[in-house]
Each structure stands twice: as C-alpha cells, then as structure tokens.
Amino acid sequence: VKGDVVTLISENSPRWLIADQGLMRLGAINAVRGINSPSVELEYIIEHSNSVGLIVQSKEVWLKLNKKNELKKRFKFIINLEDEQFEDLINWPEFIKAGEENLLKNNSFEKYNHQINDIASILYTSGTTGKPKGVPLTHANFLHQIINLAHIADPEPGTSVLSVLPIWHSYERSAEYFFFSCGCTQFY
C-alpha cells in the first residue's frame, strides 16, 4: 500500500533487487539494512520505521530477529527470499506464485502513480555514534544519482558489472539502478 514501510534485510542478490523494485512499484517505502547488523540495531530499524512488513534473506535472519517470538504479530506479512519453507514465512516460490495468480486474476499489476518527491526508501546509518539515523530518500534523490552517474560511465547494454559494495548502501544502490537502466547484466 502506498506509503507503507517494509523492512528489507538482506545482502546483495537478484532477489533483493526484485523485492526492492517491487516495493517501489507499489509505492511502498523500504527500510534497508544488511544481515550482519546487530539484532538490536535491526529491531530498532523495524520499530523506528513503523514497518508493516518484513523481507528477510533467510530463516537464519528471521531467527536472529525473532528471539523473543514477538515480532510475527506486528507484520502483515514476512517474506523469506530463499526457497526453503520455514514456519509461516512466505518463501520465494510462494511469493512468485501468488504474484502470478494475482496477475492472471486481475490481468494487470497494481499500479502506483509515483510522485518525484515521494519517499522511496529509508537508509539507516550504522549507529556507531548512538542509535542508527534514518535518512529518507525520494525518487528524485535516486533519479539525480542515476542521471549524474551517466557523466561518469557510459556502458553498452549487455555490459557485465560486478556488485561489490553492500546493496543497501546508497552509492551501490544508485549504481545498480544506473546500470540496470542501461541494460547491463549485474553479477553478485
């Protein structure tokens, strides 16, 4: 739903990018972080961002977060980016199947009329000087980066690029969006 926040905790992968872009297409805001962050930091991000949904890289990330077995009730949904079925998390094949069924039923995907200044994502600092700070980024922020990266690089469609920085880092994300918009092949 437009404006809902979904926390996305994962490392670099094609499924991260698919989840990220799917959330943006729906008008949702994603709060992103990597799996190696301390659980207290991840819990803070979930709480601070008022997340209504959660997407995790694996069951191990979910177990790390849900030590007290209290998180499940706060979310409308929890998606596991892996194929493995675990508890009542929605695994990747189930998520894809639900999307396909919805498309067949409605003959279209739900669309969101994006506004340039709508918040697209909340990036959190590492919290080295205290609690992590949430930095809201708009679609305009990302577009500015994509446009300006074109002054630095001019790849041909099909060019192979390697993702090395954490995908939830602002520069890596901007670079991925830029290379994606150029038709490059992304490797993780």
Regions found by a protein language model. Name each.
Residues 6, 23, 54, 119, ...:
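Conserved S/T- and glycine-rich ATP-binding loop of Class I adenylate-forming
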Residues 20, 135, 175-176:
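Short glycine/serine-rich donor-binding loops of glycosyltransferases
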Residues 20-26, 48, 169, 180-181:
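Short hydrophobic alpha-helices that are characteristic scaffold elements of the AMP-binding
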Residues 25-97:
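Structural core segment of the AMP-binding/adenylate-forming
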Residues 100-124, 131, 154-160:
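Conserved pre-ATP/AMP-binding loop-to-beta segment of ANL
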Residues 143-162, 167-188:
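Conserved AMP-binding/adenylation subdomain of ANL enzymes
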